[in-house]
């Protein structure tokens, strides 16, 4: 992001940007929220210096350095339009679709598994309904994987709060996320409770099966 390329004082940005490019030669330089390099006011000499330095390195090291600029679509388009040099040096543009609710649920399950937390069916169902609702209400700033990470971290904190006063702790208590632990950023517990009370149609696809079943 911007902090990795732009320095605090005049004359230091080029050095900082070049150092980052040097470290990435032979590989990939990934810059997230790349549009933050350009101030909306247009009066940002440090950001312009970073971009000019980056453009030069993209040209000079084009055989040994791949640069990926990432961010929200509209902001990225605006950034590219305001700098002809960027437009001419970007060889391809890829726009990723938002994760589907099932994908978000699977990411959540994988995070639980990787961190050795158990996720019972009731807790999994509550999380999936929450992701489905937020997907339905999503705008262009939809969090995708970041949303899931925040949900996982919030749920783990709830688990810790729930067992804080338990006198006899077991491994199962410390590592089992229950339905009441599930927290989905942007939805209250009452909203999640209401979702659970509503009828839902789910499509079940088992691994290795050729058919799916609707419930």
What are these regions (language model features)?
Residues 213:
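Cys/His-rich microdomains that often coordinate metals
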């Amino acid at each position: 992001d911007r902090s990795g390329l732009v320095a605090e004082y005049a004359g230091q940005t080029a050095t900082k940007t070049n150092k980052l490019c040097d470290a990435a030669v032979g590989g990939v330089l990934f810059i997230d929220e790349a549009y933050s390099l350009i101030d909306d006011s247009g009066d940002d000499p440090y950001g312009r210096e970073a971009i000019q330095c980056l453009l030069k390195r993209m040209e000079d090291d084009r055989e040994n350095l791949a640069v990926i600029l990432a961010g929200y679509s509209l902001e990225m388009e605006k950034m590219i339009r305001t700098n002809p040099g960027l437009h001419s040096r970007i060889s391809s543009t890829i726009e990723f679709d938002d994760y589907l609710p099932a994908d978000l649920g699977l990411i959540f399950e994988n995070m639980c598994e990787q961190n050795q937390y158990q996720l019972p069916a009731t807790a999994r169902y509550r999380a999936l309904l929450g992701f489905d609702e937020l997907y339905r209400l999503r705008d262009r700033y939809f969090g995708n994987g970041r949303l899931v990470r925040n949900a996982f971290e919030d749920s783990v904190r709830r688990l810790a709060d729930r067992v804080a006063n338990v006198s006899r702790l077991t491994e199962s208590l410390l590592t089992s996320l229950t339905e009441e632990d599930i927290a989905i950023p942007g939805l209250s517990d009452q909203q999640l409770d209401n979702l659970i009370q509503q009828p839902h149609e789910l499509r079940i696809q088992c691994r290795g099966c050729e058919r799916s079943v609707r419930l």
